Amino acid sequence: MITIDTSRKLGPIKPVHGVNNGPTSFGGLTDLSRSYKAAGFPYARMHDPEYPHPTAVDIPQIFPDFSADETDPANYVFENTDAALKAIVDCGTQIIYRLGTSIEHTVRKLYTDVPADMDKWARICIQIIRHYNEGWANGFHWNIRHWEIWNEPDLNQDDMWKGTPEDYFRLYVISSKAIKAAFPHLLVGGPALAYKMDFCRSFLEHIRRENAPLDFFSWHMYNNRIADFAARAADIRALLDANGYAQI
């Protein structure tokens, strides 16, 4: 039962109907932009685009040859991602860009390895941000503010992350510091937690010790019980506060 006290004014209700991805799929073969815009989605998080065969957003799709020169625009393939993001921008929705790769439920994993060179991976992220916010490589000036580092590195299987928790912590520290150094006005966060509260605790303790930036903490659940979501939110809030992130 929900009780509403109409005598109290608390201000505007925070919009909570954000979505994953945009109104188009498979290069525009499906385009739901009219309905998408009408829904007024405040945010679109870019993860698992065109699942299960993505051709956009993921770093391995944009920068397919990791051995190439990351400063050369010729080594980037932006076209599909440009189109996907433009459809979202045209609908008036803000983008949360997940830097990383899509989940792989296949037997053979292609892109969930730990980056061979984390510093270079961070530099690639910076070039992608420049493309969408500063016009680099025939890019745009979309002022995408939220940049999320990876997705679900806490999963048991290697569908999302083949490394250890410590490997992810290191990737987060390196890339978050590099991004904030290049773009101090942007928001960097993660880890897009799926399940494990012990991972959450260790992550927060580690980045606090390393003085790594955390502008937002991202998490989600696979559940249909509202009470469980509320309990998880309270648990994460307590961990954030205990580790000095009360401002998030």
How should each PLM-predicted stretch be described?
Residues Y97, C125, N143-N151, L186, ...:
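Aromatic- and acid-rich polysaccharide-binding/catalytic face
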Residues M1-H146, E166-G190, A212, D241-A246:
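Non-catalytic accessory regions flanking glycosidase/transglycosidase catalytic cores in CAZymes
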